[in-house]
Curated annotation (Swiss-Prot):
One of the Pfam families matching this protein, by short name: MATalpha_HMGbox
Position of the signal peptide: none
Principal subcellular localisation of the protein: nucleus
Segments of the chain annotated as binding DNA: 60-117
UniProt cross-references to InterPro entries, sorted A to Z: MATalpha_HMGbox
Keywords: DNA-binding, Fertilization, Nucleus, Transcription, Transcription regulation
Name of the protein in its database record: Mating-type protein MAT-1
GO BP terms, alphabetized: positive regulation of mating-type specific transcription, DNA-templated; single fertilization
Subcellular compartments: Nucleus
Gene Ontology cellular component annotations, sorted alphabetically: nucleus
GO molecular function: DNA binding, bending
């Protein structure tokens, strides 16, 4: 049986150097003899302290490229600016940015480049190469033609500093919008530069939905299903939709026509026989009231040609004891202009209601 050997000096040093603080304290508690504790403590003083493992802190996300910074990095290469130091060009670049009509495009380009840089690194995503590719595609003016295209003239003021003034006579001074008329997204820009050979190691995220309306419409599953059904039956979708709308419109028109035809006049009589007599009575009452109001200025008892009376001796519709004498049925004196307000209105207790 092999006898246990004592560890070497190097093995002991390696063992102690790889222990944690809690393990070192546990070893010290196991040593009972004071001399051994002293020797062990002295040995520990010659080693570097072993720190407890700390959780790995994830690296902070890099700051996204600002749209103005990208604009400045691209147009600082304007040939007329090369003879001036950067501190004299800051105000000029700010003025150009304030009047530039393509700020929205620069925001999209800055966001697209930031996404590429965060994945592949800055070394694999040179900014100048990115702008050379995408600005040419978007038909943005290059640094050499920017001032002339937007009607700017670089002059030197009395203090010897560069100054930009607008050329009123220049036809290009009225440029106020981008030359491109497309609905772009960040993903569209990334896809174009990758197809041009920029940042080939970048892996796009296929789960990201395009924020543009055209991108959402093209990726819509419902639209794909409708198109597949239309192709299967070889039937234009627009024709089917028009036929359905026409049928619904026809049904609405028929319903309106039927509802209008059902209204034939006033409420029917109890025996559901529409008799012209009741219409005549209604007209006589209305005309009589209007005539009495018109004749209010005459004295009471004056015989007028418009004083209408219905013959009370004739019965109508077989109703028993039905007599009509409109002047005696209602006393309108109370309603005359300046009439007697104390007039007594007739009582109707003796009238039988059917």
């Amino acid at each position: 049986m092999a006898s246990a050997r004592e560890p070497t000096e190097d093995e002991i040093a390696k063992f102690l150097a790889t222990r944690t603080s809690s393990q070192i304290l546990q070893l010290m508690r196991c040593i009972r003899e004071p001399a051994a504790q002293f020797a062990f403590t002295a040995k520990l003083l010659t080693f570097n302290s072993v720190k407890s493992a700390k959780p790995t802190v994830p690296p902070k996300a890099k700051k996204a490229l600002n749209a103005f910074v990208g604009f400045r990095c691209y147009y600082i290469a304007i040939p007329a600016f090369k003879q001036w130091p950067m501190k004299k060009l800051s105000n000029l670049i700010s003025l150009l940015w304030d009047r530039d009509p393509n700020k929205s495009l620069w925001s999209l380009m800055a966001k697209a480049w930031s996404n590429i840089r965060d994945q592949v690194g800055k070394d694999q995503a040179p900014l100048d190469e990115f702008f050379d590719i995408i600005c040419s595609h978007l038909k943005l003016p290059d640094p050499a033609s920017y001032l002339d295209l937007h009607g700017w003239i670089l002059i030197v003021n009395d203090q010897g500093d560069p100054t930009l003034v607008e050329s009123i006579d220049s036809k290009s001074a009225s440029v106020g919008s981008s030359h491109i008329d497309l609905a772009l997204s960040v993903e569209d820009i990334i896809a174009f530069v990758r197809n041009a050979g920029y940042a080939p190691t970048y892996i796009p995220n296929d789960n990201i939905t395009s924020p543009t309306f055209l991108g959402q419409l093209a990726n819509s599953p419902a639209l794909e299903e409708d198109q597949a059904v239309a192709e299967e039956y070889d039937t234009p979708m627009a024709d089917t939709s028009s036929a359905s709308e026409f049928q619904q419109s026809l049904q609405r028109e028929m319903a309106i026509t039927e509802a209008a035809a059902s209204v034939v006049g006033p409420d029917p009589l109890p025996d559901f026989d529409f008799t012209p007599f009741y219409e005549s009575v209604n007209n006589l009452i209305v005309e009589h009231m209007a005539m009495e109001q018109a004749n209010a200025g005459y004295t009471q008892g004056t015989q007028l040609s418009n004083h209408l009376v219905v013959d009370s001796g004739k019965a109508y519709l077989g109703m028993n004891d039905f007599v009509v004498d409109l002047p005696e049925l209602i006393d309108y004196d109370a309603f005359h202009f300046g009439g007697n307000e104390d007039v007594t209105l007739p009582m109707f207790d003796d009238i039988t209601y059917y």
